[in-house]
Amino acid sequence: MSGISELSGVTILYGSETGNAQDYALFLAKRLKYFGLKPSVVSLDHYPLKNLVTDTKYLIVICSTTGQGELPRNSKKFMKFILKKKLPTDLLNHIELTTFGIGDSSYPKFNYAIKKIHARLLQLGCSELCTRCEADEQTPEGVDGYYSEWETNLLEALKSKIHGIPLTYDETVLLPADNPVEVSSNESDVPTSNSPTELSLTRMGDGSTNLLLGSVKANKRITKEGHFQDVRHLIIEGENLSYIPGDTLALYPSNDNESVETLIQSQPHWIPIADKPLLIHGEIPFVEGGLIDKSKLTLRSLITHHLDIISIPRRSFFMTLAHFSDSTTEDGEREQEKLREFSKIEESEELYNYANRPRRSILETILEFQQNLTIPVEYILDLFPIIKPRLFSIASRPSPNSVELIVAVVVYKTILRRVRRGLCTKWIKSLQDNDRIVFSIHKSNLKFELPTTKYPPILMVSPGTGVAPMKSLIEHITSLGIQQHLYLFYGCRNKENDYLFGDLWASLKSQNKLSIYPCFSRDQDSKIKYVQHKIYEQHELVGDLILNQNAIVFICGSSGAMPREVRITLVEILMKFGKMKDTEADDYLMDMENGGRYLQETW
């Protein structure tokens, strides 16, 4: 492996569900480039695995942990490959490795993903470049505090290994674009016009993805008119669909025309070229769901379908944007310094207060600094993040011809008193009957399978739209005529306003197919406010189901307080009903997790 270049032999791989790990990877890559290195940076699943053997000398893996110790979706293929038993134990003995994990210590399997990856890579022969770091989102210093120390150690290790790395770097130097974009000078390349909807469908030409084409059958509000939350029951028709309860459906949203036009107008030099064809040089960034037809790619269509201009700007965004502020004026120099400040790890509080706390968008950031900003088209793929697909739990029993979703439309006011609308849910709300859409179906991490002989009870816990996979499971089991006891603990605000599918639950209850335990947190006459309280109210039933009847527990909903409180409540019930100590009860739940009897899907 002596032929591997020291400078280009650095590979940064990331596994990221929400974008945090990806941004740390991009930030680190830019830092290393300033030191003269030429790192590759890509998700774990999209790195050509043969390159680990041929092109990699120093391997850096940054990965978050999701759910119950799961790897992010874009790292599962990589893990499956490196776990192959036939791989020789000296396969990667030419590689020096370090890893950085992002996790939440309130979850039982804290940083489980990076531990598994790190351990397996060492088994395949990697040696350690510097010590693995496991960042904890729950600590006061947050992930940034861990990252700063780990990056310092990493840079020191690389400087000691690679000859000629400078001790410092000049952050004012603009590095060449990784994915340069230019406007085609060939007038014959001008694309024919397409409506945004029809243009989105050209993704279907990408044979590397499992895309499906469907049409909207219904898009109905199912919360009461006047209730603050608009929840949609979206029904999509398709062909040859294959899914089971627990699977998710990915949608590929687009930016609205008004936001796209606002961004273009903020950069006057973009206006005359907005609808001219683009040429992308070098490797095209990976776009999950496929790039729209490249022959129809213009600046406007690229922004509309692929550039995420509504998300909160991350550190790597500011690191690049600062270069495009005109520092020849006093205002411009001051603004450039402010943008650079937001890109520094040690100024994470400033970044949080400017971007995260008020949930300021990329578009708003550009508008705020636009007087002194001139963004070259060449750098747009280096500057803007790519729109990620949005995943929703499927809410219908398996059908080859249709699939249902329950979607809460995201609308809220920030501390700046500005109205925010979620990119995807705003798009979903606009969908009309018979609109054609592209989607894909993803298999569940839960590994939920119905037994073939004995059917243990299933205890389901879900507030709000978390009831989607429960509805899928309940309808599936009842349609098969299986005699299986189903218990649903469901929480919402009001019985009259947002008790989703209340009529369905009542009908199934009357047929003795479902035991339903609803609670309504905002109803005046409701003594039981939240699902964990309702569960404890039924502690004898729940204790008997878990300890005597081997019930499966299935929890779905928002991450954070709810799953933690439900787990604490179950520990209390096991202590009371099963006469256990707290450590014994906690171990019992852990055994249930490992045995597939305690399933949790949160976001």
Swiss-Prot record:
The keyword Cytoplasm applies. It is found in: Cytoplasm; Mitochondrion. NADP(+) binds at residues 465, 521-522. FMN binds at residues 16-21, 64-67, 102-111, 137. FAD binds at residues 359, 390-393, 422-425, 603. Its cofactor is FAD; FMN. Residues 10-155 form the Flavodoxin-like domain. One of its GO terms (molecular function) is NADPH-hemoprotein reductase activity. One of its GO terms (biological process) is nitric oxide biosynthetic process. The keyword Flavoprotein applies. It comes from the Eukaryota. Pfam families: FAD_binding_1 (PF00667), Flavodoxin_1 (PF00258), NAD_binding_1 (PF00175). NADPH-dependent reductase which is a central component of the cytosolic iron-sulfur (Fe-S) protein assembly (CIA) machinery. Transfers electrons from NADPH via its FAD and FMN prosthetic groups to the [2Fe-2S] cluster of DRE2, another key component of the CIA machinery. In turn, this reduced cluster provides electrons for assembly of cytosolic iron-sulfur cluster proteins. Positively controls H(2)O(2)-induced cell death. Belongs to the NADPH-dependent diflavin oxidoreductase NDOR1 family. In the N-terminal section; belongs to the flavodoxin family. Interacts with DRE2; as part of the cytosolic iron-sulfur (Fe-S) protein assembly (CIA) machinery. This is NADPH-dependent diflavin oxidoreductase 1.
